């Protein structure tokens, strides 16, 4: 790990240098440790590994593929890339895909298809916030970033740091909790495992997270709302 930037998570405008430098690393395909309002996560910029969001390919070269690995029949980024290090650090399978942090409700139709109106209503009510919504993936979502049932999980985070990074990168962030698979998710910078901190390219320290719990996950894939994981957002508020 190269650099740690310390910011005040409660500030409306996170430290500009921290955002700019972290976004620069993400744009190059690097891996960042970032605070959200729920727990700390490890994240990459989606546009560094896909065509879902256009990028200047003269500045950011195409990412290397791994000919020995595939998800849903599609090539995945090579070992050592930011995306693959998510799975190496967490010690989890490539098929356990990563949710996207997005800029708002419009992202449902940008990165999904056949969106139920109930999902839009729920997103308008609960976003930005601690709710992840699983939807059918649009063609622009890379095959290797989709779950086996052709879905992608989206969340608009209330964290000013996350919001600023999404704007600076011009891209969603593929982000998952910064922990060994099966271990508790870190709700503070101090709780992040040392080996994970050492395995990222840049880190943002905002102290403790406001929610101190992972997001609640819901799906509309089987004819109605299903709660897949109970998290920081109570079922009574869904």
Language-model features, listed with the residues they occupy:
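Active-site-adjacent structural elements in enzyme catalytic cores
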Residues: 1-238
